[in-house]
């Protein structure tokens, strides 16, 4: 068949259209933002700022964007994408990828692997969190799986929970998550 226009092409499918003799590609930066939220309420693993910073420092977000998401995403902080000129390029991430920093922060927060299972623990309990996502957008499971893998390298156990999109907002509003990822169009 013929294609006059296609939108929302998944990062993994872009290579299908790489033949410049067959396809004329015009692409712009999306106004879609992926939001990974942390539940910072007392009693939750992310209540301690050092744990939050450790998790963020354990994640190689630049590689996620370049490799997993085929350079179709930009790692960043604000809800405004780089295509909206509000100084995005001047922001500095204080929690860039740094496994040693992540391990040090966890140790400062009292988390150590005392039983040799590969996960840090405190008072006999592993540092464990559930990451809620939905699979309706191709990038969300990829990001969740990469987070699980990178977090394990510093001793944080991340359990992946794929939920129906229709219940995602309710889970977020009720605070029934440790980590939750979704996206919005800005």
Model-assigned labels for residue ranges:
Residues 1-42, 54, 62, 66-67, ...:
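Extracellular/periplasmic solute-recognition and catalytic clefts
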Residues 3, 22-23, 73, 111, ...:
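Short aromatic/hydrophobic-glycine micro-motifs
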Residues 9-12, 112-185:
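Ligand/substrate-recognition segments at binding pockets and active sites
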Residues 10-13, 47, 51, 60-64, ...:
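Stable alpha-helical elements in mature extracytoplasmic
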Residues 29, 34, 56-90, 139-148, ...:
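Detector for C-terminal structural segments
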Residues 42, 46, 75-114, 135-142:
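Structural transition elements
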């Amino acid at each position: 068949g013929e294609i006059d226009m296609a939108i929302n092409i998944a990062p993994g499918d872009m290579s299908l259209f790489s033949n410049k003799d067959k396809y004329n590609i015009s692409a712009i930066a999306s106004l879609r933002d992926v939001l990974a939220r942390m539940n910072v309420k007392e009693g939750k693993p992310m209540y301690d700022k050092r744990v939050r910073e450790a998790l963020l420092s354990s994640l190689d977000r630049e590689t996620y964007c370049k490799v997993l998401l085929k350079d179709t995403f930009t790692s960043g902080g604000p809800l405004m994408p780089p295509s909206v000129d509000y100084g995005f390029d001047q922001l500095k991430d204080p929690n860039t990828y740094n496994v040693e920093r992540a391990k040090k922060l966890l140790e400062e927060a009292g988390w150590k692997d005392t039983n040799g299972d590969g996960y840090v623990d405190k008072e006999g309990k592993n540092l464990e969190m559930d990451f809620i996502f939905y699979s309706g957008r191709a990038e969300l499971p990829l990001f969740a799986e990469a987070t699980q893998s990178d977090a394990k390298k510093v001793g944080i156990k991340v359990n992946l929970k794929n939920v129906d999109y229709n219940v995602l907002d309710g889970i977020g509003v009720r605070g029934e998550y440790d980590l939750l990822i979704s996206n919005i169009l800005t």
